[in-house]
């Protein structure tokens, strides 16, 4: 009967493990996948001995190496949630076995501790900056405890056999050689665990400390406690070896934060990732279905609209729109803003500022490594025609798993024996070359309006840059600058379509300057909009005109400028 109850109890416990694993996979696959995509894009793993040796620069090199190696597979659908779930399960299993090896009393104590640890790891993983290597560090700390415990058990059994074989035990055995060996093992294990698994050493220390407390009255326990405390203090001596502060020394590769699922941020990452993947229709659907999209969602939505030629038609679609043209990079600029601005300059055509923003985004990534930005640097130099620099970045990408195939194709496209497909890959970047900034890019400030003017002067048919320029003027309600830019750049295009937004803005300017009828006839080409303008003047501020620039001009607040 007792065995049957035990069997039923074990079945119930392991059923919880299975259900928990399924729940974890389902959540991260169907409700939280873009956090994992974001992590994959913000790291870089190269199959190169020179690169792999850089992991020795910080404690926990084995956990970081294994974590970054596995993180690169987050790029593939289903792979990320599977890897994360398995790593959490393995960590829970290691902790459970380690608690049992620590001989802590309680039949279900090991399972309870394992469940608590796995729940904590899932909660930590809700944060976008919690890396997989931190989970592996915990698993590694428990593994070191298990291995060292088994080695000590074997050593003690060996010493007992020697004592039984010897009728006159040696003096060393009489003094308790086993206790000294245990103390020495703990000291060595602390240093080894810290070297391999970083902050996983705290898991090892907690297991040793708890095991000692549960057997505090046994002989030799205080030797073990002393052997545990001393090396933790001696770890401070490795500060100069790793060139890091004490906090990093004891917490690397990172301690998690208890956060609830960041579903709003998940939508932001969804828009960011789908734009990166080229799924522009998904970007539009996500943003339009969101009740209150944040500034980053609006930013990518506008990028898509601008590339389709619909930016003026959708500028007033949100109460407070975000074009990104008022942002300036500085010490207080949010990390997400830094990582998105390169997309703006890429679309506008300014490769110099695109490269600058990309470099800064790379610097702001963990360990200054970002595979998405390395690929963008290769693309920038393809557009610029700097093939020597292009090859440098392509050689880096050739050593990755995800982008090696693309890098090989791009590398071959630069050669004389390029295939048709390889030439087509290069051609899409060559077609972007006429839109780059041909003006002197050395300037004292980062004025996006100046950049857009230079782009329009470099290529009068750069409609995207002109639309962004005019729309930025209108968001600021700077009618004088808008009129000047309209005359200088918009009217010089080959095909002028007289968008409704610009016509409405011109009516405000002409009415404000009391222009003559000849001026009205010169600029106002759409009589249907002019009739509605007369109606608005009779019902000024009426909600029925909320889709017009006239209403925005009267009611909306001017966006605050970033002056970093």
Question: What are the roles of these predicted feature ranges?
Answer:
Residues 1-24:
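Start-transfer (signal-anchor) and selected internal transmembrane alpha helices
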Residues 19-28, 110-126, 132-148, 182-194:
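Membrane-embedded helix bundles of polyisoprenyl
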Residues 26-85:
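Membrane-interface coil-to-helix junctions
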Residues 85-103, 119-120, 140-150:
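Transmembrane-helix motifs of polytopic, lipid-linked glycan transferases
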Residues 99-119, 158-159:
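Transmembrane-helix signature of polytopic, membrane-embedded enzymes
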Residues 224-242, 257-260:
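Internal/C-terminal transmembrane anchor helices
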Residues 249-434, 441, 457-478:
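Soluble catalytic regions of membrane-associated enzymes that act on cell-envelope
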Residues 515-564:
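Terminal, low-structured helical/coil segments at or just beyond the last alpha-helical repeat
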């Amino acid at each position: 009967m007792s065995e049957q109850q035990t069997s039923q109890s074990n079945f119930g416990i392991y059923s919880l493990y299975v259900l928990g694993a399924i729940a974890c996979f389902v959540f991260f696959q169907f409700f939280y996948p873009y956090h994992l995509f974001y992590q994959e894009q913000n790291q870089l793993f190269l199959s190169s001995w020179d690169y792999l040796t850089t992991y020795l620069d910080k404690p926990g090199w084995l956990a970081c190496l294994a974590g970054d190696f596995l993180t690169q597979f987050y790029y593939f659908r289903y792979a990320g949630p599977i890897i994360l779930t398995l790593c959490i399960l393995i960590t829970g299993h290691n902790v459970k076995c380690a608690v049992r090896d620590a001989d802590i009393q309680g039949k279900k104590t090991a399972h309870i501790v394992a469940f608590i640890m796995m729940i904590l790891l899932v909660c930590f993983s809700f944060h976008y900056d919690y890396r997989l290597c931190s989970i592996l560090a915990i698993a590694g700390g428990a593994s070191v405890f298990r291995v060292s415990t088994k080695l000590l058990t074997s050593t003690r059994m060996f010493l007992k056999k020697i004592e039984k074989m010897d009728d006159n035990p040696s003096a060393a055995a009489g003094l308790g050689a086993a206790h000294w060996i245990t103390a020495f093992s703990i000291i060595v294990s602390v240093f080894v665990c810290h070297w391999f698994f970083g902050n996983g050493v705290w898991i090892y220390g907690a297991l040793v400390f708890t095991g000692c407390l549960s057997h505090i009255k046994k002989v030799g326990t205080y030797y073990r406690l002393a052997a545990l405390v001393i090396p933790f203090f001696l770890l401070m001596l490795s500060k100069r070896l790793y060139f890091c502060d004490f906090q990093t020394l004891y917490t690397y590769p990172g301690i998690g934060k208890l956060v609830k699922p960041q579903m709003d941020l998940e939508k932001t990452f969804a828009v960011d990732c789908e734009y990166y993947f080229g799924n522009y229709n998904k970007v539009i659907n996500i943003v339009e279905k969101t009740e209150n999209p944040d500034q980053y969602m609006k930013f990518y939505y506008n990028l898509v609209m601008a590339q389709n030629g619909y930016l003026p038609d959708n500028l007033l679609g949100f109460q407070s729109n975000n074009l990104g043209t008022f942002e300036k990079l500085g010490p207080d600029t949010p990390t997400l803003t830094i990582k998105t601005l390169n997309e703006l300059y890429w679309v506008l055509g300014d490769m110099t500022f695109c490269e600058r923003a990309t470099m800064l985004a790379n610097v702001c990534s963990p360990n200054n490594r970002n595979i998405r930005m390395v690929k963008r640097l290769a693309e920038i130099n393809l557009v610029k025609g700097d093939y020597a620099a292009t090859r440098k970045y392509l050689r880096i990408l050739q050593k990755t798993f995800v982008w090696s195939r693309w890098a090989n194709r791009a590398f071959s496209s630069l050669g004389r024996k390029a295939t048709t497909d390889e030439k087509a890959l290069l051609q899409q970047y060559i077609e972007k070359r006429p839109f780059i900034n041909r003006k002197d890019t050395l300037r004292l400030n980062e004025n996006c309006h100046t950049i857009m003017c230079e782009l329009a002067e470099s290529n009068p048919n750069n409609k995207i840059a002109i639309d962004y320029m005019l729309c930025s003027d209108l968001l600021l309600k700077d009618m004088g600058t808008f009129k000047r830019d309209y005359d200088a750049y918009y009217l010089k295009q080959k095909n002028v379509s007289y968008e409704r937004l610009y016509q409405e803005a011109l009516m405000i300017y002409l009415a404000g300057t009391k222009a003559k009828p000849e001026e009205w006839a010169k600029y106002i080409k759409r009589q249907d909009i002019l009739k509605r303008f007369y109606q608005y003047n009779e019902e000024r501020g009426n909600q029925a005109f909320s889709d017009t620039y006239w209403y925005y001009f009267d009611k909306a607040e001017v966006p605050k400028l970033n002056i970093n």
